[in-house]
Every structure is written in structure tokens, then in C-alpha cells.
């Protein structure tokens, strides 16, 4: 009888230990699931973006505005050079920067961009968790970046495919107006996605031609500009970085090198865009001659 009671106690004790181990194991699993879920949640990117332009809902870190002068036609080889340069620009654009394509005609700046999209980021720019699909959808990342690349490239190609012609070329006024339109850069966080600086890339032959100032009529030197009303009308202190891709032309003996120097002088002496600014104003001659 005593032996039977001892056996029952041993079985009961063994059963209690087994139950404890099961409960402990279940708790370990639950804690692991909660910890794993918290880790995934903590590492998920919480920057919301718009479906239409792929830009953060809070705003882009900066805008790169391409301003295409459509007042005179461009040689096919020059158009190809522009396409190659813009493709490189799109590939190197930082994540959550906006790129917008604007045009100017004889009436000035068209304030509505032909296309405007933000770089949502390439998959190879993401962390391992995103690439492996734990905290993001890799295919969705690829699809968004493909939309950004293809839509912007298509807009540039279609715009360059048009015939350009106009009675005047209001370049300085268009630059001035575009500068006033660009939204202020936004910092998305304090470490990884800081606010940048807006940038305008002007693609033009630099031949300003308006009733206020004409580089066809007046000499291509700073004195002729200063003697006109152009400084008063078009003058502006630019916070944006300015870059110019110069379309080469052979017009009325006007030297492309003199045009380049004149624009550098105008920005330095009249617009306060110092030659010592970082980055400085750059004027890059495009391939071809029209």
C-alpha cells in the first residue's frame, strides 16, 4: 500500500515537471514571436509616399528641375546627348529627391511640369531585411523604381521629339519664375534622409532674346547687360544650385565661349551667384552644333 502511494507521487511529480516544461516552452515561443514582430515593426520604414508621384507625403528632400528651352530646334546628336545626361541624372538622383521636367517657350515658363516624380529608391540601396523581404516587398520596390525611371525617360524623350520654334527666348525670366515655384526641401528624419538643396538645370543655347534684352542685338558682354533694364527685371538671388547644359549654335558670328563667359559674369556680378560658391555655376557644352 505504501509502495503504491510512493509510485503515484512520483508519477504526479513527473507530470508536474513535464507540464512546467511545456508551459515554459510555449512562453518561449510566444516571447520569440512578440520579439520578432517588434523587431520587424521597429525596422520597417515609416515614410509614407504618394502613389501618383512616389514622393513622401511630407515632401521631397529636394527638387532637381530640368528646364528645357523649346524656343529653337535642337540637333539630333545634341538631343541624344541630353537623353544620355538625363539618364545618368536619374540613375544618380538620391532617394526621395524629386526630378521635374519643365519647358519654356516664347511666352516664358510653363509653370506646369511635363512630368514630376520622386526617386523611391532601388532595391540594392535597401538594407538586408528589405532585400530579403522581411520588412518590405522587394518586387514592389522594383516596380516603383521602374515606374520612376520609365515615366521620366519617356517624358524627356517625347518632349525632345517635338519641333521647337518661337519668336523670342525669355530665358532669364523663366529661370527667375521657376526658382520661385520650387517647393522648399524637407528633412524626413534627422540622420538618413536630410533635406538637400534644390537645383535647376537649364538646357539652352543661352541666347536671351526679349524686348528688354537681346543677345542678338546687343554685344555679348556684361556692359551691354548692365546698360539694359534686364538686371532690374530679371535679377534674383538664387538659393538653388544652377547648372547649364549649353546647346551649341552657329548664329550671326556669336561665339559660344563668349556667351558662356557672359552668363558666368551675369550670375557672379549681377545675381550674387559667386564664382566661389560650392558648387559653382557650371556651363557644360553639349555635343553637336546647330
Positions of predicted regions on the chain:
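Acidic, polar low-complexity linker/tail segments
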Residues: 8-66, 71-78, 91, 227-229, ...
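Von Willebrand factor type A / integrin I
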Residues: 221-290
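DG-centered beta-turn motif at the end of beta-strands
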Residues: 68-71, 178, 196-209
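Acidic/histidine-rich, surface-exposed loop or edge segments in extracytoplasmic proteins
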Residues: 60-73, 154-161, 242-248
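Sec-exported extracytoplasmic/periplasmic mature domains
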Residues: 87-95, 179-187, 208, 268, ...
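Short acidic, S/G/P-rich loop/turn micro-motifs used as interaction or catalytic elements
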Residues: 71-75, 107-110, 207-214, 249-253
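Von Willebrand factor
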Residues: 59-195, 200, 284
